[in-house]
Amino acid sequence: MLRRFATYLLAVTLLATSLAPFSTFAAPTAPSQNSHQRRERKLAPELETATTGTVRVIIQSKGRSTAAQDQAVSARGGNKRKALENLDAMVADVPASALADLAARDDIDYISPDRRVNAQMDVTGEAVGAKLAKQGYAGAPGVTGKGVGIAIIDSGISANHPDFKKNNNKSRIVAAVNFTTGLAADRSGHGTGVAGVAAGNGTASTGYAGNYAGIAPEANLIDLKVLDDNGAGTTSAVLDAINWAITNRNRFDIRVINMSLGTPVRESFRTDPLSKAVARATQAGIVVVCSAGNNGRTEQITGYDANGEPIYRLVYGAINSPGNSPYALTVGATDSHSTVKRSDDTMASFSSKGPTQFDHLAKPDVVAPGRRLVAPMSLDNPNSAIGHEDRIVAPVSPTARPNSYFKYSGTSFSAPVVSGIVALMLDANKSLTPLLAKV
């Protein structure tokens, strides 16, 4: 991902060798005749057998959604819930018995169900070269991601955490929108951890054993909440958040979207609404970073390594959507074994592996540290760590604020490592395009 860029950006030279590339990006080719025939089946597989009740669906248009399409939904007993203008789509509740008739319209491209989506730094910054990038290298100025907007589409961000505030106590979260029906607070803690890995500034780590700053500590954060207290959400909420990010790209200088969430792949990226939304965001000039997923192994233990760690039976072809999009910068996880050196890094067995279902694309694109990353804990729910008290990082000074940091694992936390690195790159070169950042 970063090799070409490193040839002319010395300030982030180490980043070029810190992320291991898994595949080279290629723009999607034109669909074959067989894939074209599949597209003529304009209902997602789960909807083809639906006959009773009302179903919440994502209706993709051929071109802009029109009043005629709204009327067609209404005439069939449906109810339009939300227009997604930037995505040429709408969210609607439609009787199952009317779906086939609606899909037969020439101006309808594809109809999918509103699927469920789910959620998926002590030495991390130094291990991927971010520390050197911040300091500067060979006479080049340091970069911190200053002013670059990173949209965190997740469970929210704990705005009161010191790591998300500037020296003047002003929040670095420049916008916050709640796309769920619940509270805006991050009661699951997932989004706070993700945001901290990408762009926490480590303010609260005074009195701890290390400086737990994220990769781009001066980037701006945009909090787009789509997941509930249990880390679950809907496709429509994610699409709504992506649509909002595209609309407000210039207002908040949104150059990066991080999505540490996903849903199992059930169709080609050519019809999957999340994958198509990733393409739209990329075309709007936003780098979209996605977690690969945590379905890389079964729970069957086949042996133990030299350190006594269990070896699990691996699973292939388990990349989640929207990480299956060729436009997404999809990130798998490594285990850095809590060291700075990379010679002892190994692939995390839980990290989902390619190829992608249906399209057989090589994924993930890169891997980054994703095990035992220290990042901020949410202050919105003191009970979020119950059952995982051993992963709370204890301070070494009695004057330090306790319960400020947590050890996270998963590709959910590998992805924001890369999002932070992209922000550093954009800090150094504002004209960097999403496709150039990816290759």
Language-model segments: residues:
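Autoinhibitory N-terminal propeptides
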Residues: 2-141, 148-150, 162
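Subtilisin-like serine protease catalytic core
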Residues: 30, 71, 79, 137-177, ...
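Second-shell loop/turn segments in exported
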Residues: 54-62, 87-89, 138-139, 180-185, ...
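Substrate-binding/access-modulating region of protease and related hydrolase catalytic domains
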Residues: 67-71, 97, 144, 181, ...
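Mobile, glycine-rich extracellular loop/lid and propeptide segments
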Residues: 73, 85-86, 91-95, 101, ...
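Conserved G/P- and acidic residue-centered "switch" motifs that form tight phosphate/ATP-binding loops
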Residues: 154, 191, 293, 412, ...
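Short amphipathic alpha-helical face segments that pack within enzyme cores
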Residues: 193-197, 240, 416-424
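Short Pro/Gly-enriched beta-strand edge/turn motifs at strand-loop
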Residues: 343-351
